[in-house]
Amino acid sequence: MMALVRDRRAHYVMSIVIRWVHCFSSSLRGTFGTRWEAMKAKATELRVCCARRKREAREFKPPQMRGSTRLNISDDLKIGFFSTDHATQTDSSEILSVKELSSSTQKLAQMMKSLQVDFGFLKQLLQLKFEDRLKEESLSLFTILHDRILEIEKHYQQNEDKMRKSFNQQLADAIAVIKGMYQQFFEVEEENVSLQDASTVKTNILLRKLKEKEEVIKELKEELDQYKDFGFHKMESFAKETSSPKSNLEKENLEYKVENERLLQIISELEEEIQINLKENSGLEDELISMKEMAEKDHKTIQKLMDSRDRLREELHYEKSLVQDVINKQKEDKEMRKKYGSLSVKVARSAKGREASLSPWPKSPPSTTALRPHSATMSVSSAGAQKAKMPKKALKEDQAVVEDKHGLESQIEALKANLENEKKKVERFRKEADRLNKSWEKRFFILRNSFHVLKNEMFTRHTLFRQFAVLADTSFNYIKVKPLLVQSRTTMTAISSSSHCTSSIDGKHVDVVSDQAALQLSPKGKLSESPKEESLEEPSMRQSSPAETVD
């Protein structure tokens, strides 16, 4: 009975082990392939052995014991009073199976230990991989945050630079306004300083500073050398003199050390100032490069404006020539009309002469006209047929005069219609020329104002850059300014100022008048010009409104 229980337990344990091995075979097949195969083979062998032992035990049992489930060792030993006491002994045939079961359990325990070790290694490997992945993710997050912080700092610095520049610009504007208000009532005589760029002034100032600092450094180095030489000589003299006390030597040595430290500190400060000046020089060089680029851009814009002005002048000359051609055509049309008028007058006079020449006398000569060929033939026929009867001749002449009159009236009506058409054409050409003149006057006015605005902007920009360069590093050691001489403008001679003002005003007036005259006399001819250009000119006129206030 005990053997059967043990066999069942062994079978149950083996089934659990095999099931567990089947569950983890998919995950551990790559790393523990050979060990898994060995363990599986051993498990199958144990299973086969257990089945064979059971079968042999059943076959070799005596017939009297085949029906009972209890073993026969404890049947003869009458120890207890109950039936449960009979199954406490082990049969001799069961000893071998117990040994095999114990050996198999030991092997299974060893395998479990090895599996525990392997699982420990796997756990450590997964933990290390997780830590590496965590470090990578944290590093990526740190880099992203660091880049974002750098971008924010850069944006903040840019905003700070913009604010600083705007404040400097406002300060320069306020100073310029105060200077202009001050110069309205007083005349200030200052030292004539050569007009240089702001960058050159700054570089000269910094070079002067560098030279001064270098001279100071040289002087301090010379003093240091002198102190060192003097100290060494003194030490030698003190060593020779045995009567000199040691306390004085120590005091002087301390004083020299303090002086040396002070000089070294001054030298370090001067070196720091030199580095700062070098940085300022580099910044000024960058500003100089940017100013040069801005000047090149301004020069390019001015060149473009000059090219556009030349192109507009060429178009203006072309329009002038076209309008002159139109005027010449109009003059030719007028001459043709005059010729037609004189012709009509001559025809009327000839008609009147014919009517006067017609009379009731038979021997009156026939009237001839130069315009109608059939009248000449009639006169020739009438001259050839003088012997005809008088009533027939009179009737024929009356018919010819009536026909001539009708032809002349039709010609006069056609000429009048042509005259009306020509008048309408001339009026239309005149209106078109006026419209084109006005549009071109507007264009030239806008172009001139924009050109003046660009010139004023360049001038103000350069003046403000100079003011900024002077105000950026204000110091009393840079430029020695003379005392200002303030004079009231009322004490100045009125002749020079009046002459200067009148000459400048006359010059401006003459320029404006000449421009207006040129614009009025310059007729424009592009009759087929589209109205899109006028619509494009309107925003430019709106933009040029502040330029008019500036002028």
Curated annotation (Swiss-Prot):
Subcellular locations according to the entry: Mitochondrion
InterPro entries per the UniProt record, alphabetical: C10orf67-like (IPR040119), DUF4709 (IPR031651), DUF4724 (IPR031711)
Feature: compositional bias, Polar residues: 366-384, 541-551
Disordered, as annotated region: 354-389, 519-551
Transit peptide range per the UniProt entry: 1-36
Subunit structure: Interacts with NOD2.
Coiled coil: 203-315, 405-439
Name of the encoding gene: C10orf67
Pfam family, one: DUF4724
Gene Ontology CC: mitochondrion
Name recorded for this polypeptide: Uncharacterized protein C10orf67, mitochondrial
Transmembrane stretches, start-end: none
Origin: domain of life: Eukaryota
Keywords of the record: Coiled coil, Mitochondrion, Transit peptide
